[in-house]
């Protein structure tokens, strides 16, 4: 999951920026989820704290942004731990990552670099020359980084983050208020990063977690580019929305039903674009376990694409 945990350091109570995984009582926890064109926004109100997280992939980029704004709506100063959590696979082959544990756990390692948790697959190959492989293998790098606030603590081991007999709804790393600053070697990897936000009454602060699979040097540059977090994220979302609204503007219908108009003009068209781009792969994040890319399905999606984007080659 793309989990963000919020912990009140005064009361030691904690919750998540989406209702799950913590799952607070809905009589006290209020939440909304909005799906837009290429982004999702989740808003939550609990214990005098309002949070809004926007998940998206910037236009023409290959990493995720989890843009979080937190507002103190109470009448007293609040100290909050904010923890972002991403669970990495060990083997990029989804099936092998599940069943071939004696191999998939053997090849994984996590370390902390500057403001991010770096996961390396086949880390022992990091000394070979760029572009070269051994047994068709090279180092694979994944990361979760933090922009807009300093890192207070981190964890790269799923078992250590969750704790024995704990689940994603009550991880020890969040309950304790401090991650253990330990990486992982030959176990199950994760990337967890905690920062502490001090908020005066009425104050809002904005941060971003960045997640991707890219070499370490480039990952560092990506995180550094979000120093002015709010301005960068707002601009990226404006570009993303403008692009998709432009794509969807070429073919529009107008009927007496607003719901039908929305379905045809936005969601049917957007879904056809997505399934065309991904070609009906089994998931948006991997292409294993099913039957890969479907030529027939892609041709079916073209029935709308050639109307909505007539200049597409």
Model-assigned labels for residue ranges:
Residues 1-298, 308, 312:
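Anionic coordination/interaction segments
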Residues 301:
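RNA-binding accessory domains that recognize and position tRNA/RNA substrates
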Residues 304-305:
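Cationic, amphipathic, low-complexity alpha-helical segments enriched
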């Amino acid at each position: 999951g793309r989990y963000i945990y919020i912990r009140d350091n005064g009361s030691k109570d904690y919750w998540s920026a989406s209702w799950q995984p913590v799952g607070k009582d809905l009589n006290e926890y209020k939440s909304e989820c909005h799906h837009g064109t290429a982004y999702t926004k989740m808003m939550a109100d609990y214990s005098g704290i309002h949070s809004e997280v926007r998940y998206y992939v910037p236009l023409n980029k290959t990493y995720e942004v989890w843009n979080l704004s937190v507002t103190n709506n109470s009448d007293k100063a609040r100290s909050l731990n904010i923890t972002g959590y991403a669970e990495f696979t060990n083997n990029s082959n989804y099936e092998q990552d599940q069943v071939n544990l004696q191999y998939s756990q053997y090849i994984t390692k996590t370390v902390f670099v500057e403001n991010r948790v770096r996961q390396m697959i086949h880390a022992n190959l990091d000394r070979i020359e760029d572009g070269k492989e051994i047994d068709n293998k090279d180092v694979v790098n994944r990361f979760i980084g933090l922009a807009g606030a300093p890192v207070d603590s981190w964890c790269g081991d799923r078992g250590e983050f969750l704790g024995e007999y704990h689940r994603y709804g009550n991880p020890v790393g969040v309950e304790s208020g401090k991650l253990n600053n330990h990486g992982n070697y030959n176990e199950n990897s994760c990337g967890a990063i905690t920062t502490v936000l001090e908020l005066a009454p009425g104050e809002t602060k904005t941060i971003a977690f960045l997640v991707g699979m890219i070499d370490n040097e480039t990952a560092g540059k990506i995180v550094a580019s979000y120093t002015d977090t709010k301005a960068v994220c707002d601009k990226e979302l404006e570009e993303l929305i403008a692009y998709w609204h432009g794509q969807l503007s070429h073919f529009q219908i107008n009927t007496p039903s607003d719901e039908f108009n929305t379905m045809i003009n936005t969601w049917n068209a957007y879904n056809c674009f997505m399934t065309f781009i991904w070609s009906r792969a089994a998931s948006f994040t991997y292409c294993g376990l099913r039957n890969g890319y479907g030529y027939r399905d892609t041709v079916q999606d073209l029935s709308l694409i050639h109307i909505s984007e007539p200049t597409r080659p």
